[in-house]
């Protein structure tokens, strides 16, 4: 679990390797991540957009930008949370993701809420000695 908080907006990310969606022989490793966004502040906010920085095990950077998350632009009142799960394929068995959500207050002010950097790693496979 990875956590960051910006201006009362808490972002918690829990990643996991999805073996059944992966094909190591084809250099395809699929990871899922669940994000929980909680408004610990006093103002109602709306998540407007996302910006991800995805870096694979070779150091190749991919940036992803878009409106909302999973097709939604949730509005969070004080004390409210929103969770979603999404996924990311990588050509390597490890990598990292990080980014920001653009949040807007009711009065139109925008700010960037930090998405903590988190690791994407295939769990170590047990080695069998013969």
From Swiss-Prot:
Residue ranges occupied by any ApaG domain in the UniProt entry: 3-127
Biological-process GO terms, alphabetical: error-free translesion synthesis
PANTHER family assigned: F-BOX ONLY PROTEIN 3, POLYMERASE DELTA-INTERACTING PROTEIN 2
Stated name of the protein: Protein ApaG
Organism the protein comes from: Methylobacterium nodulans (strain LMG 21967 / CNCM I-2342 / ORS 2060)
Lineage: Bacteria, Pseudomonadati, Pseudomonadota, Alphaproteobacteria, Hyphomicrobiales
């Amino acid at each position: 679990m990875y956590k960051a908080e910006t201006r009362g907006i808490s972002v918690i990310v829990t990643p996991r390797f999805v073996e059944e969606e992966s094909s190591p022989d084809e250099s395809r490793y699929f990871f899922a991540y669940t994000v929980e966004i909680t408004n610990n502040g006093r103002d109602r906010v709306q998540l407007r957009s996302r910006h991800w920085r995805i870096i694979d095990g070779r150091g190749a950077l991919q940036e992803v930008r878009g409106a909302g998350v999973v097709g939604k632009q949730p509005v969070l009142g004080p004390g409210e949370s929103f969770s979603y799960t999404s996924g990311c394929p990588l050509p390597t068995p490890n990598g990292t993701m990080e980014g920001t959500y653009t949040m807007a207050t009711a009065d139109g002010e925008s700010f960037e809420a930090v998405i903590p950097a988190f690791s994407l790693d295939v769990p170590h496979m047990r080695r069998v000695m013969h």
